[in-house]
Amino acid sequence: DTCRRQRQMCIRDRCVKEDIIIIMQAANTGLTGGSTPYGDDYERPVIVLNTMRIDDIHIINDGKQIIGLTGSTLYNLEKKLKPYKREPHSIIGSTSIGASIIGGICNNAGGSLVQRGPSYTQMALYAKINKNGKLELVNELDINLGSSPEEILSNLQNKNYKKSDIKNTGKLGSDDKYPEIIRKINEDTPSRFNSDSRLLYGASGSAGKLAVFAVRLDTYRSPKENKVFYVGTNDPDVFWKIRRDILSKFKTLPTLGDYLHRDCYDAAKKYSKDTFLVIERLGTTFLPTLFELKRRVDILAKKLKFFPDNFSDRLMQFLSNFWPNHLPKRMENFRDLYEHHWVIEMSDEGIVEAEKYFSEIFKNQDGDYFICNEFESKKASLHRFVSASAIGRYHILNSKNHGDMMSLDIAFPRNEKNWFEKLPKEIDELLSLIHI
């Protein structure tokens, strides 16, 4: 009975004893490949553990903090926090596609978030393999849940704890240093980068090396108003100046900032169109069904030899060609006018600051801007988000003509001026699609 109630811990314990590789999987929504086995050269047997059925979210400390269990999603957290006028760490993109709370913590997600920085907490409940090779449950939630693994997991899942069991010891439930770090524009180090030791703590940044059962996180006050500024230029130095001015002079930092090169814009428009339309029109509830349909279609296509590989992707790409242009006219006009695009979201007092700044700077600098209406805001943010999947779709459709796909995630120093890389001609000519 205990093993049935604590099935996940028991499965992990058995896998450790049998020397089986465990791949933790939550929403599996990564547009560039999620938590799935890759290749056929693993040295040991592999098991994939999906956690989505354990999706409870506990609101604590009057909505200022939450406890997210292993399969809880940002989408559901956003809904639960609305009555408290609070928001989760990530509200763009990740919530749209149903990503998990814990997946973000394990990968320090939040690359475009300026005010909030990377996902981070020092409070979590997780299992690790100790120095003796045994599975060990570690409770760093700062909540009194009992002593034995069975008791801790049962009390947490059943919310069997009192307000007095919740300790407030000063441990962090978010990255409180990032706004200060990102404003230091003359430093010769990046503001954020992979495997930053500052952000590696327990579950945070663990990236699959731990089995995480729950995390305790801070929430954020919902702004009264948001506005998206769509900015374009043909001169990379203009964006360099804007970035420095905003980070060093604005009283209110942007909520987020997302860059697109014209090539990226075009690739996303063509190769991520179906993903865009599915998320926009059917929402997250249909995504699991869509993924399952794609999987079944590909299995069937493999049995029928006259169908090509990755048939579902090829079919969706073909059908998307019949759908009319899904992007707003003003975005399309900027695509024709400008090579470099920037989606900047401001909130509350920052809106007036940004409007005054942009109306002045483009009087004597190359480029222009417009303030998105609600329709354009959603389209611009979603277009940037789905662009991550475009290179994968392109590679699938053209795999016979090209070599492997290579992804580079580059963290520039904060004082870097020459941020836009111009490749040597002999290299540039060998590349079929550069996706920035």
Predicted segments with their positions:
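Single conserved hydrophobic/aromatic residue that forms the stacking wall/gate
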Residues: D1-R7, I11, I434-H435
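General beta-strand structural signal in soluble alpha/beta enzymes
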Residues: R4, I21-A26, G33, L49-T51, ...
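Transmitter module of two-component histidine kinases
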Residues: R12-C15, I20-M24, L31-D40, P45, ...
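Short, structural beta-strand-to-alpha-helix junction motif
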Residues: T29, Q65, G71-L77, S100-I101
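Glycine-/small-residue-rich beta-strand-loop submotif within the FAD-binding core of flavoenzymes
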Residues: S35-T73, S112-R116, K134, L217-R221
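FAD-binding subdomain of flavoenzyme oxidoreductases
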Residues: H58, Y75, K82-W240
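C-terminal substrate-recognition/cap domain of FAD-linked oxidoreductases
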Residues: R216-R221, K227-I434
